[in-house]
C-alpha cells in the first residue's frame, strides 16, 4: 500500500471515529460491552481478594509514582494519574489470569482496555455511555 493510500485510509478511519456515536451501536454490541466490562471488574475484584501479595506490590509501585490526577486504582480511595491507574488496574485485573482471552491473537484485551478506558473516563469525568462509545 502506497503512502497516498495510507493517508486515505487514515482519513477514513479518523472521520469514522469522529462521527461515531453510541446510538450507532446495535443493542447486542452494547450489552456485550457491558458484560465485557463486568467480567474484567470481576477479575479485578478476584485479584484484590485472591492475589493479595501481587496486588500489594502493584499498589505499592503505583504509590511510588507520586502522580496526581482524578483516576483511581480499583479498591483504593486515593486519586492518581490516568496512566498510573490504567497500568495498576490492568495488572490487578490480570493477577488471577481469569480475564478474557482473544483466541486468534492469544491476548487478554479486557484487562488493558477496561483499565485504560476507566482511568481516562475518570480523568475526563465521563459516564458509562461515554466509556462504551
Language-model regions, residue ranges each:
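N-terminal core-entry segment
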Residues: 2-133
Amino acid at each position: 500500500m502506497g503512502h497516498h493510500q495510507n493517508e486515505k485510509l487514515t482519513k477514513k478511519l479518523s472521520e469514522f471515529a469522529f462521527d461515531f456515536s453510541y446510538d450507532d451501536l446495535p443493542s447486542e454490541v452494547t450489552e456485550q460491552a457491558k458484560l465485557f466490562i463486568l467480567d474484567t471488574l470481576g477479575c479485578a475484584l478476584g485479584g484484590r481478594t485472591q492475589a493479595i501479595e501481587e496486588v500489594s506490590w502493584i499498589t505499592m509501585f503505583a504509590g511510588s509514582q507520586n502522580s496526581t490526577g482524578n483516576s483511581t486504582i480499583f479498591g483504593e480511595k486515593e486519586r492518581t494519574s490516568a496512566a498510573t491507574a490504567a497500568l495498576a488496574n490492568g495488572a490487578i485485573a490480570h493477577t488471577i489470569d481469569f480475564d478474557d482471552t482473544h483466541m486468534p491473537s492469544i491476548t487478554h484485551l479486557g484487562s488493558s482496555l477496561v483499565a485504560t478506558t476507566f482511568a481516562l473516563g475518570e480523568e475526563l469525568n465521563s459516564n458509562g455511555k461515554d466509556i462504551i462509545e
